[in-house]
Amino acid sequence: MVTDSAVTAPAGTESSVPAGLARSWLLVPGSADGLATRAGASGADVVVVDLEDGVAAADKGRARRALVAVADAGLRPWVRIGDAASDEWRTDVALLRGRDLVAGVVLAKVETPEHVRRTVDALDGALPIVALVESARGIEAALEIAEAPGVVRLAFGSGDFRRDTGAADDPLALLYARSRLVSTSRAAGLPGPVDGPTVRREPAVLMDASRHAASLGMTGRLCLREEQVDAVNAALSPTGDELAWAFDVLDTLERCGIRDGSDLPRIARARAICGAAEAFGIEADAAAVHISDYAS
């Protein structure tokens, strides 16, 4: 049982991966037992203390007190709060306003840029916002939401989107929604969006879903359990072989220069791979052998 007494967080366990690059976003209910330990030791790039759907109505107050206790223990997780049209939202922003409790806010059920603006204004612009898009209205307003001041990333609430639209839990059925979030994120100058979670527990299902998300241009995923984190991080990270390819491309560019316009996409991809690998602490595969695209 979560109590309001002081808790001690594990030392040295918070991720240094910035939110714009974060792959794994672990949702931990604010009412969960051992919240500070889970938040500090999960291995996720970002831990999100859930005050919204993951917490029963009767436990909301206890979850908010637990979030404060986590902050008192020295951790700064993100927090998912109620949607901007709800009474819970008012209570959540009142808790956060003017206090150094969290690193950022995942705003639930965003359907219009006004939902973001209300939240940013209520928090005096002090916290970055990940806008969780979970409905047909939200998907169709995705560009305006992405361009709202304060938004640093979009995320896909796939479960609620399926409930809203009647879509199946199938990659093809959700292809439009995911692709629209990718495209609008790019158009708004944001990083790739965060995909919704995999509910099923089979590791192969999780890995396939994560690779599918990556193939569309999504660069993060919500996780529901700690055991999902490693697979999500692996699926959304450059491999050692890919990093070796990127080094080869950039090295050859330095020696030979650009031959034609078709080189530019490869160079951009190589630089993106190197940047992500540096953030994630990934080293090139020394055994990888690549033949330069520019070699004479």
Name what the model sees in each region.
Residues M1-S296:
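Expand to "…catalyze enediolate/carbanion chemistry for C-C bond making/breaking, isomerization
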